[in-house]
Swiss-Prot record:
Record gene name: tusA
Database matches in PROSITE patterns: UPF0033
Keyword Cytoplasm: yes
Origin species: Aliivibrio fischeri (strain ATCC 700601 / ES114) (Vibrio fischeri)
UniProt keywords, alphabetically: Cytoplasm
Protein known as: Sulfur carrier protein TusA
GO CC list: cytoplasm
Length: 83
């Protein structure tokens, strides 16, 4: 199954930022989104390969897809239901 990263509701450009900035920006952006909307994150910090999946698990968001084979890394997240 091919994931189309271009269908994201919003995009967050986090290239050039280093830990913990990318995840902080993801959190801030997702807080403003509606449940079910999708966020494409583009980043080049190697720590995002660990931090973004962990953030999704911890905050109950769905990591739909990730592409970490080349830079920039891309992550597609669906915002979980607000509690």
């Amino acid at each position: 199954m091919t994931i189309n990263f271009d269908t994201a509701t919003q995009t967050l450009e986090a290239e050039g930022l280093r830990c913990p900035e990318p995840v902080m920006m993801v959190r801030k952006t997702i807080r403003k989104m509606e449940d079910g909307e999708t966020l494409l994150i583009k980043a080049d910090d190697p720590s995002t390969t660990r931090d973004i999946p962990s953030f999704c698990r911890f905050m109950d968001h769905e990591l739909i897809a990730e592409d970490t084979d080349s830079l920039p890394y891309r992550y597609l997240i669906r915002k979980g239901l607000s509690k």
